[in-house]
Amino acid sequence: MLQLFLRNCAFRIIAVGKVRKGWIQDGLAMYQKRLPGLMITEVRDASLPREAEAILAALNSNEVLVPLSEEGEALTSVSFAKRLEKYGSQRLAFVIGGADGLSAELKNSTQWQLSLSAMTLPHELARLLLVEQLYRAQTILQGGKYHRGS
């Protein structure tokens, strides 16, 4: 199962808005090189219902939608890696809302919501944190030395 997961490791981030800060762009570029299966799709800022429509329109039928929300499930890095492994070769599409978050309808229509923090984060920073955690999860599952936590 582990080898299948690593071989088919493909994630997508659907994010509202653009990244404007150079240091975040640099960090994203670095992790995207390390995660060749990662795709990032940006949707325009709009009202929550319109953003939800754009997010759902961008979603492929074979993708599992995982919204990021402060109300979502908080996981350790190791627990996150194990959760990703359970999805096997299914493609996960993580969704990061804009300044107003995500519509309740979108969040409630999914099986799993993920929380990066109980605090509200700027969407640009949430994107960088998520990409780093996806990379960390991959190295945990591969037995790499990047993750040094317990």
Swiss-Prot record:
Q: What SUPFAM superfamilies does the record point to?
A: alpha/beta knot
Transmembrane intervals: none
A GO cellular-component term linked to this record: cytoplasm
- Protein residues bound to S-adenosyl-L-methionine: 68, 97, 116-121
Query: Matching InterPro entries, A to Z?
Result: Alpha/beta_knot_MTases, RlmH-like, tRNA_m1G_MTases_N
Q: Which domain of life is it from?
A: Bacteria
Question: Where, per UniProt, does this protein localize?
Answer: Cytoplasm
EC class = transferase
Q: What's one GO MF term for it?
A: rRNA (pseudouridine-N3-)-methyltransferase activity
Catalysed reactions, semicolon-separated = pseudouridine(1915) in 23S rRNA + S-adenosyl-L-methionine = N(3)-methylpseudouridine(1915) in 23S rRNA + S-adenosyl-L-homocysteine + H(+)
Q: What is its EC number?
A: 2.1.1.177
One Pfam annotation reads SPOUT_MTase
- Assigned keywords, A-Z: Cytoplasm, Methyltransferase, rRNA processing, S-adenosyl-L-methionine, Transferase
Q: Does the keyword Glycosyltransferase apply?
A: no
What the entry lists under PANTHER family is as follows: METHYLTRANSFERASE, RIBOSOMAL RNA LARGE SUBUNIT METHYLTRANSFERASE H
Concerning its family, UniProt says:
Belongs to the RNA methyltransferase RlmH family.
Question: What is the annotated quaternary arrangement, including any partners?
Answer: Homodimer.
Q: What does this protein do?
A: Specifically methylates the pseudouridine at position 1915 (m3Psi1915) in 23S rRNA.
Q: What is this protein called?
A: Ribosomal RNA large subunit methyltransferase H
Name the species this protein comes from. Answer: Prochlorococcus marinus (strain MIT 9303)
